[in-house]
Amino acid sequence: MFRSHGTDTPREIWNFGEKGTMFYDAIEKFIKLRYHFMPYIYSLAGAVHFEDYTIMRSLLFDFPEDREARTVENEFLFGPSLLICAVTEPMYYGPESTVLNREKTWECYLPAGTIWYDYWTNEKYEGGQYVKVEAPIDRIPIFVKAGAIIPVADGLVYAEQEPEKPIQIIVYPGADGEFVLYEDEGNNYNFENGAYATTRFQWKDAEGQLLNGRREGSFPGMREAVYETVIVK
């Protein structure tokens, strides 16, 4: 995930200004966010290989009974837990670099039947409604489903890098949930021969308890599993 494409057009971050400028800093922020989510993304990629999973999902995949979700064309689910509201209109500059003076907010639909957390503020919203949220250039509207268990890591700068700190297991209360963390060597195809490990996490909302399942499997160079649990308030 996360690779810009084009023909005879600039794609590298340094083509969009210098560090400290609006566009450069926005791109850098989301590059770092992508690596922050790498344990989550990598686990979903494992599910794609082993279970024919779909990472980028129409809202109807998970909310087939929500009629309003059928009309939403600029949102998608990223795995089971994240709702991404793509900003599909220019907010800063128009044709020929004309400056646009418009509100930096975006309206998002939150599917019914669950609670949603604003990823940036942790504010909670009931599903089944449209909400207007801040959407400056460095903040794509992202919502997290109640019951989500999201593994993240700090300090990563490439996909197969081993985290220096324990993987954080972020829990968003409000419903039961589960997530399977997938791990392998990260730089070869040994997983096709069984060299990988999975760990199932379960959140019991009524008890406020996160269950850490047994780590199943192994691969060369596998480190001892150490996790840090964070419960979002």
Each PLM stretch: what is its role?
Residues M1-D138, L181:
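Catalytic-domain carbohydrate-binding cleft regions of carbohydrate-active enzymes
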Residues I137-K233:
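Accessory, solvent-exposed terminal regions and/or long lumenal/extracellular loops of proteins
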